[in-house]
Amino acid sequence: AGGYYTFILSKAVGETGTVYAQNTERGLRFVEDRQNMTQGEALNAKIEQGNLHNVIQIVRPLPDIGLAENSLDFVIVAQTLHDYYNPNSQRALEMLLQLKALLKPGGVLGITDHIGVAGRDNRDMHRMEIQQAIELALQAGFGVESSEILREPRDDHSRSIFDPRLNRSTDRFLLKLTKPL
């Protein structure tokens, strides 16, 4: 919502690519605590200051975001899958299926989220277990690969991701989900 990955992806795809920054109105209203502005204001600032002319904002919830099926090469879900999963795993599966429909055959869905552990209150801590995400991806029909690149061993998974002692340095998983050809 705040534009961190939007900035990176805009630079990665260059002038010939397009980045769709999809958010909900509710998500854009959250306060970006490090910058004392809303997520929407932070996103707009990154777009303006970064000269990100290839970014198109979509402020609508899934599934009806106005993009054609089989039209996207890559989608990223950054630290929000737990928000869908923890209240209702079926809702998370539906989201993955909706995103899969938007991807071209062979397209990639990247997912990163805060790692939770069994037996802890992952909902209140805004986390989820890696295996839960992998099982959802397999149920949705994706090929699944994982990476350890976002792991943070100092996070023992016992605190909310918003705990200031973590300074946002949470232990995260990274999954590469591929839509079959």
Question: What is each model feature region?
Answer:
Residues L52, I65-I76:
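A short acidic, Gly/Pro-enriched loop at the edge of an enzyme's catalytic core
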Residues N44-I47, D121-S147:
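Conserved Class I S-adenosyl-L-methionine
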Residues V31-I65:
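S-adenosyl-L-methionine
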Residues A140, D156-L181:
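Core SAM-dependent methyltransferase catalytic element
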Residues L62, D73-Q90:
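A short SAM/SAH-binding and catalytic strip from SAM-dependent methyltransferases
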